[in-house]
Amino acid sequence: EKALLDWLEEYADINRHICGVEQYRDAEWLLSDADGDYGTLRSFLSARHFREFTEKEARLSGDSQNAEAVRLLLEDAGELLAWMRHLPYYYETERQILVHAGIAEWGGEDWLCVTSEALMVGKTTVSRGNFYKDVIAGHISTAKISGDRTYDGIWSDGSSHYYLDGTTWRSGKIPVLEYDAETGRYRER
């Protein structure tokens, strides 16, 4: 965890992580994990703590499950989560908007004026079609978007939208979208 924080700090101007940490303040996200087996929670917890949580969860109420998950999260990844709270909700370049979940595209060039932080971290609908900038997001599983449960790569609509949430917990692969500023083209690495 410390090595990751040091690396991210060193390369902060090159590597941008668009924060979705607001969702960690209200732990409901833990109980509605799209992969059905707490994949997000598992990614933050040690194997011992994840096993401890799954052994207890059936005996706990929803609120108690959340409290226990948060307790374990803070114990295992508290420093990382605290650091993530300081990250921006979006990052904008001349050509792209990078965001955790999505934006209110109906606002056009005024999208920022009409997009709430809740939408930036919790949007669950897929946007398709042309937009004046490319929108690069995660949050929604590319397996779900593509309709292929085994798909774990980057999904694009061929216009202005790229989704990166590629079930890393299963594949062991982190989808990376590379942009070539000279050609204006993207490629998956």
Label the predicted regions:
Residues E1-R189:
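Feature recognizes metal-dependent phosphohydrolase scaffolds
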